[in-house]
Amino acid sequence: MHSENQSKGVHYAKSQRLLEINHAHLQLMESLLDEGKKHNIFKPDIDPLQVNINIAALGGYYLINQHTLGLVYHISMVSPQALEARRKVIKETILSWLLVDPSSTAHE
């Protein structure tokens, strides 16, 4: 993705399949959010595009920088324990933003 951004997305734009995959993923997120909004689980003003971007950012930064972060913090960023901890942080971060009542256990 980094090198594709450096080339201003010219190769990505040529791939109909990649565009279809991302469109389908966005539609799925929209459907999930709509269902949650209908049941007053998710806040009404949540943008599915922003949810996708935030999930990608929270996971992507971690993985892309795993080697330097691992050196700085003296840990394996990809050990099962580290990945589970990261997954939990991402889940809690996203749900605290999406949920009408973040203290609810409806999402578990």
From Swiss-Prot:
SUPFAM superfamilies documented for this protein: Tetracyclin repressor-like, C-terminal domain
Superkingdom, taxonomy of origin: Bacteria
Protein name in UniProt: Putative uncharacterized protein YtfA
Gene3D superfamilies: Tetracycline Repressor, domain 2
Recorded name of the encoding gene: ytfA
One Pfam family linked to the record: TetR_C_29
